[in-house]
Amino acid sequence: MTVYSTPRGAATALTACRRLSAMGRLELQLAPLLLNSNKRRRLSLNSTVNAIAREFLENKQILALQRKLENRSKTMSNWLTPWWLDYAYLMSRTPLPIVTSPGVTFPKFNFTGLQGQLECAAKMIHAVLKYHHNILESKLKEDKAGGVPLDMSQYQLIYGTTRIPKHGKDEIRYGKDAGKWAQHIIVVRNGHSFHVPVYDTTGVPLSVPQIQSQLHKIIAESESVNAFPINICSSDDRDKWAQVYDRIKKNNCQSISSVENALFVVALDRTDGRSSPSTADNMGQAIHGGGPPLAMLLDYVCDQFDQEAFNTTSNASAFDSPSKLNFQLTNDDRNAIIEASNRIDKAAANLEIVSLGFDHYGKNVPKAAGLSPDSFIQLAMQLAYYKLHNSFACTYETGTLRKFAEGRTDTIRLPNEDSAEFVQMTSSRRPDFSKLAKYLREAVHEHKDYSKMVMNGNGIDRHLLGLKILAKLDEPNSTLRLLSSPAYNRLLQFQLSTSQVPTRHVLPMGYGPAEVDGYGCCYNPQETRIFFSITAFKSSSISSALRFSKELQNSLHLMRDIIDQTSMGKTKPKL
């Protein structure tokens, strides 16, 4: 059981040295590297690890690396983000679907038949284009957390962003850097890809009827299934995809350019999932800006449907018709398509997904007891895991750094000593509810305090990552005892990978586990209900998304009982 966070003094020192970026956002500076001394800021309960930590902090190489990292933070608006993109995403060679690229389900829209599908798709495209212009015209309401404004630059990265496969490290291209925004999208149907203009010749977005007419035009050319859809190779291992990409680019430059420059991709396929997937490189990934900005877009699309806020008046200006992308492929390319298709089918079949709508209560219950809803839900997941596996789960929770310019994420960790005490006490045969209430409150406050530290730039995970990267850059063959120790490596093996992505509409979002025997758990706490998307790998003999979902419900019920049957349910302490 391990927790590593910065000391109380570090937050003050950090605040004092922050600068404002050119956009008026706080610049992410570096916290002092200090040894935690009290219980709340302990490094570990393990004396061996503490000894290694003391040695680590007194190491001359570490102190030199810390100075270099501090200098980097003084010369950049965000010392972390460029490295984070490279090491967490672009250098990763694993396939994008399942773990890196999240999936999301829209509410069921009421339509029937092909015509209804095309009208619904046209409205969705129209709404997404409207949101694009809201971003360009700075019409979005500023995001805030606890009254603090958040960096909005990530919204600029949603449209036209493409990850180009390269050997060893991919390349990221942003639509905003193209000089001129694209005016087309890619539509995929039955494995066929189409370049579809969505603006008229004067640069005005097409109306819903005009977009629908564009979609109608591709139907006749996509009735049969394309046996060799090259898009599917983008779902493969990144080096394998890079090898195919290098081959096909020679004879398909125009088609590839059309895909890479598109604003976004739309798939008009069957619900059984047997049609070929759209291009993974051009889909909404965490690399585009994270869950919350994408969630805001999805909420906006749903709002447009609720309000029927669509432009149905067509302009008189002409617009270009869709054009089919015909790829010239070799036998090697066709074999690569078959192999990639088999691999993604196998990976998809191995993923267990449980969508849980917990409608007994939502944020209202923990809030009424003066408890943080997020911390409350995190403890419920800790309890569920412990009851299933009789062990504590090394847990990753996404902590936003959007308070800072170009901010991405850091890690909010569990378990800690307080959460462990609560979980163990709750799992005892005859739990004392009055004691459980005390443990629950302490565990919630401990998690909430560390969450605030992380979001204020005082998290330890990215700090250690920075030191590790610098060490490798300075001396590629060097090893730092702590950063190569089994204890540190275990810290990076997350049995629970969690993230809160709040939306107003019911938009379940999910992703796969970080470990073969772990769980992915994306959750959306609303006022009177909580939605979870829980995943596990079917090949694991240890994890089960279904069993976890049942134990999670039991934990949530038990935690409400603790509130209702003690003074927690009668008083409302200040959050």
Task: Pin down the residues of each PLM region.
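Long, Pro/Ser/Thr-rich low-complexity/intrinsically disordered regulatory tracts in eukaryotic proteins
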Residues: M1-L575
